[in-house]
Amino acid sequence: MSSGNTSSQNHSPVNNQPTRLKSPLPALHKDTQPNTSHQATNVLQAIEHARHFLPAQGPISVFVHHNTLHAFEDLPFEKAVIEGGRRFGCEPYLSEERYHQELLRGRISREDLREVLMADLQDDADKLVATFGTRYTLRLSMLQTELQPMPESGLSWVLAESELLKRFREEVPAPYREKTITQTRGWVMRHLEPITTDTTSSNPASPLPAPLQDRLKAAGESQIHRWNDQQWESFTLHALWETCQQGVEKAEVQTPNTASNDSLHRLMRGELGIDLKTKIDDVLIRFCGCFLDQGFADWKLPERENGFAKAFADLYLGRWAIRADWMKHVDASLREVQSPDWDAIQSIEQSLERMGISNNECEGFLSECLLSLRGWAGMIWQMETNGPFLANPIPEGSLNEYLAIRLILLAHAIEHFGKAKFNVGTASEILRLALKSADVRSASSVRSRTHTVFQLAQLGGWTPEQMLNMSSAQWRCLITEIESFASLDRRRLLHAAYERHYANQALDAISIHSRRRRELATNSRRRPAYAAIFCIDDREESFRRHLEEVAPDCRTASAAGFFAVAMYYQGADHASFRPLCPAIVKPQHYVREEPLFSSMAAGERRAVRRRRLGWFAHQVHQNSRTLIGGWVTGLFGAIATVPMVARILAPRLTSQIRESMGSLVRPPATELHLERLADAPGSDPASMGYSLDEMSQIVVRILQDIGMVDAFPPIIVFFGHGSGSLNNPHESAYNCGACSGGRGGPNARAFAVMANDPRVRRRVAEQGIELPDEVRFVGAYHNTCNDDVDYYDLDLLPRSLRELFRRIESDVIETRARNAHERARRFESAPLDLTPQEALEHVEERAEDLSQARPEYNHATNALVTVGRRDWSRGLFMDRRAFVTEYDPTVDDENGHILTRILQAAIPVCGGISLEYYFSTVDVEGYGCGSKLPHNVASMVGVMTGAASDLRPGLSQQMVEIHEPMRILFVIETTPEMLKKIISENEGIRRMVEGNWVQLAILDPSTYTIQRYIDGHFEPHVVTDREIPTVQSSMHWYRGQRDHLGFATIQESEIKTPVSSSESDANTSEVLV
């Protein structure tokens, strides 16, 4: 059996796609009988270690962004992507072709390549390579042009049918091309022998290779003198090829044979011609879907409460069970599963012994088996351990039972299909014989090496004469050097250059802009007209920026979007509680939205009506699948297509009609059950909510985090955020990450209620923050998909503040249109000449379009996190690519407690979002979930591709198609000493920072100078760009553009008087003229 070379990645000659890294097979020994005595402890430890590699994504309704390679965070990023790629069969970086496209369009510069290569080589940069200069110059040449690997099987066709030996590559500089042709022509003419009539022999004394002599003889001496430029170019390339091939043969560099290191399933597929994995997966996919079902299926799986294994055995031992032929002898094993004393771990031990898997191979083998259906296996583990509020929880031990059943099926499949070829009946003997017969092949060939050297010779201006004069030792040195810098190493450095380019642009822009802001010497402590507090989400960056342009006298700030209100929340229309806090936090408090006391009876009647309607709709859905229901659906089903077609052809109009009909019966006014009467929190009515002391701690924490401890404006609006769209199974992934994929409106509302309570304010004052009586907090919800904004509890706003609130409302309306206009430029279906109001209508339509696969782009393009005062980043156009986190060093203490708690959330959360986007972009099929278009919801817990596949964790193609995969860059306003202290004292932060999973820089609070964190120490950032553009408004910078944009300074607007909504729309449209 052949095995791929995992040290580098080559492009296929057909589709030019990178070869996938393969996962290792446990080292099953061919010639020795392994020790297969397994102890339960060893098996449990092996399972515990193997399950770390399973996806950590829970049910899709609570989608939480996280580092896809979380199991490898103890390794540096550069090693982790290789190990993860090998284990999961995925790509660690973009393809070389993609990086070179970025090089050609200027996204990577030659200077970036030189800097990252020099940093990588260090003292080895000046090592000489044959006669072609240094290691640095050779590798730089290899980085600057895409080397197109070609296997032996494809070279014959390319040599015969393409222009490989007729035209130089387009990337070859013209001077190199002319020099090579001219020098080759002179070399040939100097050694041109008189043409003889004997064309069957070559002159051994001639320095020209024999094939070139034959070519010259075939042309004839008189014709050679009349060759044009194209003919000499072709001859030069033939000469270059022949000398390269001769040199490769002369070098005699041996490629070590690689032992079979493939997976067991690929081994058996190669030996038997049958994919055992597919056979087993077909059985388990359907059963896992039934077992994990959360209400999607019509029938409940029998015996589900008895566990995975017993339910499986009962189902497949049933009288009407339908089984594949290879499962006909599995009855005895399944009957053992039905016995009361059956144990999953003992069953796993027996299966390992049956297949001859030794103790040393146990962990790797079990890991391979779990990862065979890693989506389903990961979901079983997540629902077993992290599913307290599932409608249908699963029993403890389900993952072990899943593995036990899989191994039983695998052993039977090996014996069933292997017996015919190897004429033995035991799984262990079949595996031993299969390994013995596996082929071992060499990883490289003479002609494929020749092709690589041939490409470098063109790019480097190496002449045939120069290469013909090289010794065998020099050729060995050259080939060894080339092969030591394989595709994977080149992609690693190309990616480093890709990241460096953006990081330098970002740090230059922040340095220049912060200096400009400092020169303005504005007083940040003056009392603003009002304040707007947002989540740190990158989608809110543009909303904040536009609001600041519309209302220069307002102040904006940001904090994690759960606003320190960690709770299990149940809305008035929700069937159950759900967590609204970061995934790393386990809430202790329960909050419920309830009708006002005066509307309790109306609320109860509405709840009864909703339950009845829900029951009726469920019955209609269920009965439509029966025989009679099918007839009825066939007769009257066409009527149901009317609203569906309307949602596709006129989604916005359909939405308005639906909302108008819904307004006929408005829901009653509600309030939050927020104050707790009991001593301890819980889910019963008396235990719901927070104590007054807990409320005051939450208010103090957020006000300190955002640096708002004095000069309070009359109204402070807290904007939670979420996203709403149709036909989008991943909708929770578009919601607030700080709320575990929930919507942050209830958190903003709860915070506002807490901060407005006079009893809470008295306790806050005791901690040093005086909130004046006239200051009011308002909760709001921003829908990032359609840019709609809703406000909570406005009836509680004093009449004296209503005029100011109307001004806020007007500013927000204009901001919505401007923000939608900036967002719409990224949508191909939105013309670039839309007015802001038309853009707002466009995004509203996208959110209601049943056929829309891209309602919004979510966190796509995220690349930067700023942690510091808004003073130095206000007015900086960051293209919706930055998480903007508020932090005021002057409010913090000498130990940095405020910064520590901010970074404890920001680095794992923002880093996790960035890394999930990174991995889903570099391999959207392996780490991501592919295209949304063939997805089907499975069991209400995830999506499958088509009718039956593994669950697809990760992000879809439509979510990452405009993303640039980079490790996120943190720019933190603090000192080196403070940040080093925080890193050393916090393991989670230390692992992410020292492992290079995130990039780090600091902005000095006093001097605004920037230093980068590199290999454990800080280095000053040298600004290369002295200026960045200054524009009148954001629209003046981005209009007419669809691609990523650079940084720019937005001119500070003068404070304007309030304008009406219609006037604001007209003024906004005027800017685009």
From Swiss-Prot:
Residues 1-35 are annotated as: Disordered. The keyword NAD does not apply. Signal peptide: none annotated. GO terms for cellular component: plasma membrane. Zn(2+) binds at C535, D537, H721, C736. InterPro entries: DabA (IPR018752). It is a peripheral membrane protein. Part of an energy-coupled inorganic carbon pump. Forms a complex with DabB. This is Probable inorganic carbon transporter subunit DabA 2. It comes from Rhodopirellula baltica (strain DSM 10527 / NCIMB 13988 / SH1).
